[in-house]
Amino acid sequence: MRKYELMYIANPQLDPEKLKGLVANLSNVITSNGGSVLSLKEIGLKDLAYEINKHRKGYYVWMLVEASPEAIAEYKRVVNITESVIRNIEVKEGE
């Protein structure tokens, strides 16, 4: 298993309960596919460098995970179809 840094920006208009559900759901994608979340940091609401999907702010969440490439592929699939996520990135640690 490899370590990855995952970061996504959630829609700033989500209410706190839906945001907690989103964070739990995306963390669960990793753990249910045999990976583990080593660290999770909810950075909070920040200004975006440029407008994304008509949003000027976004709620940033960062995770350090240890997972197989298959688990990361499933995470990418889920995060790309989740409407509440306006941007995401996955980086293999060491690159």
From Swiss-Prot:
GO molecular function: small ribosomal subunit rRNA binding; structural constituent of ribosome
GO cellular component, one term: cytoplasm
Segments traversing the membrane: none
Keywords: Ribonucleoprotein, Ribosomal protein, RNA-binding, rRNA-binding
InterPro entries on file: Ribosomal_bS6, Ribosomal_bS6_CS, Ribosomal_bS6_sf, Ribosomal_S6_plastid/chlpt, Transl_elong_EF1B/ribsomal_bS6
Swiss-Prot/TrEMBL GO biological process terms: translation
Domain of life: Bacteria
PANTHER family attached to this UniProt entry: MITOCHONDRIAL 28S RIBOSOMAL PROTEIN S6, SMALL RIBOSOMAL SUBUNIT PROTEIN BS6M
Function: Binds together with bS18 to 16S ribosomal RNA.
Family: Belongs to the bacterial ribosomal protein bS6 family.
Protein name as catalogued: Small ribosomal subunit protein bS6
Species the sequence originates in: Acholeplasma laidlawii (strain PG-8A)
